[in-house]
Amino acid sequence: MSAGRLPDFALDAAHPLGGRFASLGIRAYRDAASHVHLLPYGRNSDRSDWRLVLGEGRGTCSTKHALLAELAHENGRRVALVLGVYEMDEANTPGVGAVLKPNGLRSVPEAHCYLAYEGAHVDLTRQEGEECQILRFLHEEEIEPHQIGEYKLEVHKRFVRRWAEERGLDAVHLWRVREECISALADQPQFGRRLWEG
């Protein structure tokens, strides 16, 4: 979903984030969102610190969207950061089927962050096109940028435990398979600008 669904307003360069974007020649919110969208996927050196996205030139669904939510807040605008959990499968995340199938699974619960503005879900880390979109979230909640670390991980693990229990599966094994899926995705050459978190 494109940056065009986000509000557009001038960034205040007197504020810390506005100043960082201004130093890159970026003075409007949508331009900032487009810039962040084009940065490659990659875990930051501290995956819970969205402040590292611009300096490290990469980010994940959590760090990129948290940065943009905070940038909006800094400028007195409300753009929500949402944590969702969905069933990751080969259809919505090409490349994970090769890990899931040998483990007897069709899907595993995965956490994903995106932005919400005036009823629109805006995901700047997944490819455009419906075939790779997440069509249904099993859990969604608005979070603050500082919650993308431990809090997000705990929500995700708690959800995986419950999901596994409901299906008579081993939660530890399920989490291990999920980690293998993420590794398989990270190894894909086209992965760099596509999606993901961890």
Stretch-by-stretch model annotation:
Residues 19-22, 54-58:
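Second-shell loop/turn segments in exported
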Residues 57-84:
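Cysteine-centered nucleophilic/redox motifs
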Residues 26, 58-62, 66, 105, ...:
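Alpha-helix initiation and capping sites
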Residues 6-11, 42-43, 47, 67-70, ...:
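Transition segments tied to proteolytic processing and entry into folded domains
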Residues 2-24, 41, 82, 86-198:
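His-Asp-centered catalytic microenvironments across diverse enzyme cores
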Residues 39-56:
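Short, conserved helix/loop micro-motifs enriched in His/Cys and acidic residues
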Residues 32-36:
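Short alpha-helical scaffolding segments that buttress acidic/His motifs in well-ordered protein cores
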